[in-house]
Regions:
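A short Gly-Trp-Pro
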Residues: 1-11, 16-141
Length: 141
């Protein structure tokens, strides 16, 4: 994985969508969400400010999905279906970026990934974001 101060090259699976992104805090807040949608999507996301993603190619190849409050915006490649990023409901000035799209990064690079509560969303409660579990990966020897 590269340092947090560097820009990361990123792409969907088929390469139709390509972008550069600067992460807000490197990989320190890599996380999953427990909401009904993210539970099915299964991606590990890292953070970037809305202005810190620049599309190199294929922005027109993205399709948008929204549900429930229509606040969060989830983008996917129309060709291969890979989720690239989403605008967060908890902070609309921030994107969650799929780590699997980042060049040289895999979700399996993270031995532990916190799972934040998306069922009782921080926007719906005064308690703010909370961790409801930890997803662990241990490679076979």
């Amino acid at each position: 994985m590269t340092s947090e101060s560097q820009q990361h090259e990123a792409a969907c699976h088929c390469g139709a969508v390509r972008f550069r992104v600067r992460l807000t805090d490197g990989f320190r807040t890599a996380r999953r969400c427990s909401c009904s949608y993210c539970r099915m999507r299964g991606a590990v996301a890292v953070s970037a400010a809305v202005g810190d993603i620049a599309f190199i190619a294929g922005e027109e190849n993205l399709t948008l999905y929204q549900f429930n409050t229509l606040t969060a915006k989830h983008w996917f490649c129309k060709t291969c279906g890979i989720y690239t990023h989403h605008q967060r409901r908890s902070n609309p000035r921030e994107f969650g970026v799929n780590v699997a799209c980042l060049e040289g990064v895999s979700p399996f690079d993270f031995p532990e990934v916190p799972v934040v509560d998306g069922v009782f969303h921080p926007s719906d409660a005064a308690t703010g974001s909370r961790v409801v579990g930890i997803l662990r990966f241990e490679a076979e020897s």
